[in-house]
């Protein structure tokens, strides 16, 4: 049995903003120096850049990156550059990625998430910081594993009911 093909409603811009706020609040949690915690802002940013590239672009990515830089007290622009590159590459592949299943989409998104985590590391290494270690490589994998869940949650308000409602005019 195949999954039904859903006809999606237009996305509400308030819901997009709400999803970014919730992802940012997740990133604000006091994890300490734990490197394997997924970057939910990056995951939500890739999702909206793939599904709604005209509503969420590189400007939003840059602004969110600056917010993350201020939160992490890092060099101003580390996350901004990483998120801008992430948005650019996600918008570049968005038409191709949408043709695949959710699990294959996760495999397509995984290199983008690795790039997003590698850019701040390269910037810090150029500034003379030590190499952070292997747990940093786990975070993009966890984010890719969260891709099907993020897709289900973030597309849920747009999905129409599969059951026919007799009282609905359209």
Regions found by a protein language model. Give the residues of each.
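Terminal, non-globular segments
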Residues: 1-170
């Amino acid at each position: 049995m195949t999954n039904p093909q859903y006809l999606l409603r237009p996305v509400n811009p308030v819901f997009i903003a709400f999803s970014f706020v919730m992802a940012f609040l997740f990133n604000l949690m006091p994890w300490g120096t734990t490197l394997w915690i997924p970057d939910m802002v990056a995951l939500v940013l890739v999702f909206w850049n793939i599904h709604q590239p005209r509503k969420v672009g590189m400007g939003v990515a840059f602004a969110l990156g600056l917010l993350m830089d201020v939160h992490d007290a890092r060099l101003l622009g580390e996350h901004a550059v990483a998120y801008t590159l992430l948005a650019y590459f996600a918008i570049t592949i968005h038409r191709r990625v949408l043709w695949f299943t959710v699990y294959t989409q996760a495999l397509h998104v995984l290199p983008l998430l690795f790039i997003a985590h590698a850019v701040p590391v390269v910037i810090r290494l150029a500034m003379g910081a030590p190499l952070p270690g292997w747990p940093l490589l786990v975070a993009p994998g966890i984010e890719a594993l969260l891709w099907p869940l993020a897709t289900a949650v973030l597309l849920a308000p747009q999905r129409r009911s599969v059951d026919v409602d007799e009282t609905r005019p359209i």
